[in-house]
A protein has these predicted regions:
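N-acyltransferase acceptor-side catalytic subdomain
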Residues: 1-380
């Protein structure tokens, strides 16, 4: 039986390097990913909660104090002016204006990594108590499991019993792979879509575009940074968060063979790329970059980089699942993907406020008013 004394907190992924990759089945919950984020200050206050039994790590809950305000970009809007209220609370010295988050940045997934022999409610309860203690010691008013999958039975069934409130969050998409070759995959789709995909692959080639897998090197890292910024600015013109070339080199350094990079070239010039992360039997299409001036819509570079090449790779290497993130619902469903609903679980850590907060959030009238007048942060 695991005791509370065997639940520890580490502040760098270096301290859980071996166990995290062993327990994880997800590329965004690995040493290489978290080490890259820590190196760039993109995970400013990490907390790796571990549960041990007889000297072995049996569970890890990656969390962090949200100093980058991810909650107020991706979470549910539970009460009016929450961010302002937390800012006032911090100025008065009552509570910090940050939320403790359990999730891995950039992947829209929350996971607790368990040894398969200890995936039970007692370990989850101990980790939850440790979160309670951290929030009390550091004066953090709210914690959140930000993106819990509808398929995560342990978290879905038990977090509410641990005084977390549940709210729907974004819908992501995934593809389960059971085909022996790409033609079998195409044959699983509707006839019109099969024809369309074959045409898009042929058109890409006919336009002189070649797509090959490459390693991240100094020669190409600058181009990855440039093309990623072009795509980011297209969808968010106010964004100034350009990833430097050193980010890609650092990711290659720490993630190593977990990096899968497809590069599209025309006349030997890089015009696009897709960056994937792989761990064990899971592949995640993480990033896409493009030079829109060097191609037209008839090149179909995006679909080849973001869908067809990753699917072909996964089939060839017997990978079981690909994550494709959120948005573009019709595009993803037409290509065989399935939706995966995520939920945010939120807890107030003030013993006086928690009962009234839970009562308010469960009130049907308030829920209707909230859904009408308080758009969730991720919908803005």
């Amino acid at each position: 039986m695991v005791s509370q004394d065997e639940v520890r907190v580490f502040h760098t992924v270096d301290d859980v390097r071996e166990s995290i990759d062993q327990l994880s089945d997800d590329s965004f919950f690995t040493y290489g990913w978290f080490k890259t984020l820590e190196s760039f200050g993109m995970l400013p206050d990490p907390l790796y909660l571990t549960a041990s039994y007889e000297g072995s790590t049996i569970a890890i809950a990656p969390c962090f104090i949200d100093k980058i305000n991810d909650f107020f970009s991706w979470g549910p809007n539970i009460i009016p002016f929450l961010h302002r209220l937390l800012n006032v609370s911090q100025r008065l010295g009552l509570y910090k204006n940050n939320v403790l988050l359990c999730y891995s940045p950039a992947c829209c997934r929350t996971k607790i990594l368990f040894d398969k022999n200890y995936n039970d409610t007692s370990v989850l309860s101990l980790l939850s108590k440790k979160i309670d203690n951290i929030c009390k010691e550091q004066k953090v008013l709210f914690s959140s499991f930000l993106f819990v999958s509808e398929f995560d039975e342990l978290l879905m069934k038990n977090l509410e019993h641990l005084n977390y409130m549940k709210f729907p969050n974004i819908v992501t998409f995934y593809l389960d792979l059971s085909w022996s070759n790409f033609d079998d995959y195409l044959n699983s789709l509707k006839p019109g879509m099969r024809k369309k995909i074959r045409r898009e692959i042929k058109k890409c080639s006919d336009n002189g575009v070649t797509i090959k897998e490459e390693h991240i090197t100094e020669n190409i890292a600058d181009k990855l940074s440039e093309l990623e910024a072009i795509v980011s600015s297209k969808y968010d013109p106010t964004s100034n968060n350009k990833l430097p070339s050193s980010f890609f080199l650092t990711l290659q350094k720490y993630a190593k063979d977990k990096i899968r990079l497809f590069v599209a070239r025309k006349n030997d010039e890089v015009i696009g790329f897709s960056l994937l992360l792989q761990h064990k039997e899971l592949l995640d299409v993480y990033m896409y970059g493009s030079d829109y001036t060097a191609q037209t819509n008839t090149f179909f570079t995006y679909f080849n980089l973001a869908y067809y090449k990753p699917i072909q790779l996964a089939i060839d290497e017997k990978i079981k699942k690909i994550y494709f993130r959120y948005l573009n619902e019709k595009v993803r469903l037409d290509r065989g993907c399935r939706p995966e609903q995520t939920y945010s679980f939120i807890k107030c850590h003030n013993v006086l406020l928690q009962p009234s907060m839970n009562t308010l959030l469960k009130n049907s009238l308030y829920s209707k008013l909230r859904s009408r007048f308080l758009p969730d942060y991720f919908k803005k």
